[in-house]
């Protein structure tokens, strides 16, 4: 059953201005100041935009085939103390990127082998080439239905295709985008993650406003 969304009471001209600010990556608070609307109104409008994006991205979630880069990453949390894999207070996420194509990203409970393998099997066609780094959870791919290529970051020499630069670049873009919000509640993190996925998959930037306007139907 499709969930019905309430029609916005904002004038179409105001909605269009807020859409432009959202696509530009401006925070809701700043957008409120620039458009002259109430701050809470802008916050709610941006929240609804992200909910629409999550719904649409779920509908077009790709089933990937060919050369696929996979990687987990960790977002947020305090900067002090342990960093990287398993860092306390951080949100673990997992991503799959088809080279020259789309990315799929999601929050995960943990980065254990069976967790990651389950997602890979759900989203990647058997016999695809799967590139990973040397994290031990990916060892299960060595005896799977996929062709596993492991990347060793400690080696200075990198073969032309032996890398996961694409998915790492996506993580960098996503973290840079989220950093401007000065902390995202975990309960809403998936909305922002899917926003980053949408921005990547529907680039270049000029297409984002067109796509989102069609989804919102202002």
Each model region followed by its residue ranges:
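Residue-level recognition of single "structural anchor" positions
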Residues: 1-218
């Amino acid at each position: 059953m499709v969930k019905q969304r309430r029609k916005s009471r904002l004038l179409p001209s105001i909605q269009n201005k807020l859409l432009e600010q959202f696509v530009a990556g401006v925070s809701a608070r700043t957008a409120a100041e620039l458009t002259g609307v109430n701050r809470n109104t802008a916050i709610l409008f941006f929240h609804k935009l992200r909910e629409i994006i999550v719904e649409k991205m779920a509908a077009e979630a790709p089933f990937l085939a060919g050369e696929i880069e996979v990687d987990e990453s960790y977002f947020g949390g305090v900067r002090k103390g342990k960093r990287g894999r398993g860092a306390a207070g951080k949100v673990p996420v997992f991503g799959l990127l088809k080279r020259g194509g789309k990315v799929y990203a999601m929050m995960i409970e943990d980065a254990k082998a069976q967790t990651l393998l389950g997602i890979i099997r759900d989203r990647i066609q058997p016999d695809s080439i799967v590139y990973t780094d040397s994290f031990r959870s990916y060892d299960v791919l060595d005896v799977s239905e996929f062709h596993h290529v492991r990347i060793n970051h400690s080696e200075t020499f990198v073969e032309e295709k032996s890398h996961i630069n694409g998915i790492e670049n996506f993580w960098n873009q996503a973290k840079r985008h989220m950093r401007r919000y000065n902390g995202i509640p975990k309960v809403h993190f998936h909305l922002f993650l899917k926003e980053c996925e949408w921005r990547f998959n529907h680039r270049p930037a000029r297409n984002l406003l067109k796509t989102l306007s069609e989804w919102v139907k202002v």
